[in-house]
Swiss-Prot record:
Its cofactor is Fe cation. This is Multifunctional dioxygenase ausE. Multifunctional dioxygenase; part of the gene cluster B that mediates the biosynthesis of austinol and dehydroaustinol, two fungal meroterpenoids. The first step of the pathway is the synthesis of 3,5-dimethylorsellinic acid by the polyketide synthase ausA. 3,5-dimethylorsellinic acid is then prenylated by the polyprenyl transferase ausN. Further epoxidation by the FAD-dependent monooxygenase ausM and cyclization by the probable terpene cyclase ausL lead to the formation of protoaustinoid A. Homodimer. It holds the Pfam family PhyH. Residues at positions 150 and 232 are important for the type of reaction catalyzed, using identical substrate. Both ausE and prhA accept preaustinoid A1 as a substrate to form divergent products through dynamic skeletal rearrangement. AusE (containing 'Leu-150' and 'Ser-232') first desaturates at C1-C2 to form preaustinoid A2, followed by rearrangement leading to the formation of the spiro-lactone in preaustinoid A3.
Length: 298
């Protein structure tokens, strides 16, 4: 049985070698990367989405719902030029995702599942502990040695503190012998799970496996809105939460780099099967980007 008492969150600067960050991720299932997004980029991004955030009504439900006093906004790529031209062009993110999802010679083995701003309001209750891979219910049943299905980069837009609801993580829960739902019926450790708060400054992020137990903390402040930017990525074989190509206008898509176009589903990925090459999300055996008239990424 895995330990229910984590000791720490490993931290690395964004300038650290990707192999070192990835090794910590493999060990604990989560790792903090300091300076993942430059603070000036994050400040401009926050300003650009502010009008949209102000239009979202706060729900007060008191029923354990994950949206209780939490604002969520996903139309980032169409709202923020800084997001689509700068933040998305994060080479370290791709270096790490290549190590998690991709095989040599097969291009990107991953795409975006969702990109979202999550703002925890004053008084918001703690979120129930969960694993993100519960989105794909069968994945837990494959155990800790299964390939990753989902990796989240969760970035601080405003400071993350214990008081304002910093995410609480359970390092090492990715390696528990049984990956279960976190409830009294399914989880032997239920009620005995200790967690570690992800204390971060704007621009820092934690990279987290879909296998790791976590949940937003209680925002006990009177006025502090804890804002985060989350990149949820999944292996290319899985269907994403967001139907990006159906609501991102082509005018916006053509502004994106070929790499980012692929992340949002405007280009195909390839896999070599014996002697054949398969295009995922393709068009009659060809890259969907050709059908859309996008400039070749070659």
């Amino acid at each position: 049985m895995g330990s229910a008492t984590p000791s720490r969150l490993q931290k690395f600067p964004a300038t650290a070698p990707a192999d070192e960050i990835y090794a910590a991720f493999k060990e604990d299932g989560c790792v903090i990367i300091e300076g993942f997004v430059p603070p000036d980029q994050m400040a401009r991004f926050s300003q650009e989405i502010q009008p949209a955030m102000e239009k979202i009504q706060v729900q007060v439900t008191n029923d354990g719902n994950s949206n209780d006093r939490v604002k969520r906004f996903s139309k980032l790529v169409t709202t923020s030029p800084t997001f689509r031209h700068e933040i998305l062009e994060n080479d370290l993110m791709h270096e790490l995702l290549q190590r998690v999802f991709s095989k040599p010679g097969e291009g990107m083995g991953y795409h975006f599942n969702d990109t979202m701003v999550i703002e925890v309001q004053p008084g918001a209750p703690a979120q129930r502990l969960h694993r993100d891979q519960e989105l794909y219910p069968w994945w837990n049943s494959m155990g800790p040695d299964a390939p990753e299905c989902l990796v989240n980069f969760f970035c601080a837009v405003t400071p993350f503190t214990v008081e304002n609801g910093a995410t609480r993580l359970v390092p090492g829960s990715n390696r528990w012998p049984e990956l279960t739902l976190i409830n009294a019926t399914d989880c032997p450790q239920y009620g005995k799970i200790d967690s570690v708060p992800a204390i971060m400054q704007p621009g820092d992020c934690y990279m987290m496996s879909g296998k790791v137990i976590h949940g937003a903390g209680h925002n006990a402040t009177l006025s502090d809105q804890r804002r985060a930017l989350a990149f949820s990525t999944i292996r290319r074989e899985l269907r994403p939460v967001q139907a990006f190509p159906l609501w991102i206008p082509m005018q916006i898509a053509t502004e994106l780099s070929p790499r980012t176009q692929a992340m949002f589903g405007f280009r195909s990925s390839t896999q070599h099967c014996d002697v054949d090459t398969v295009h995922f999300w393709g068009n009659d055996g060809k890259d969907i980007g050709e059908h859309l008239g996008l400039i070749s990424s070659a």
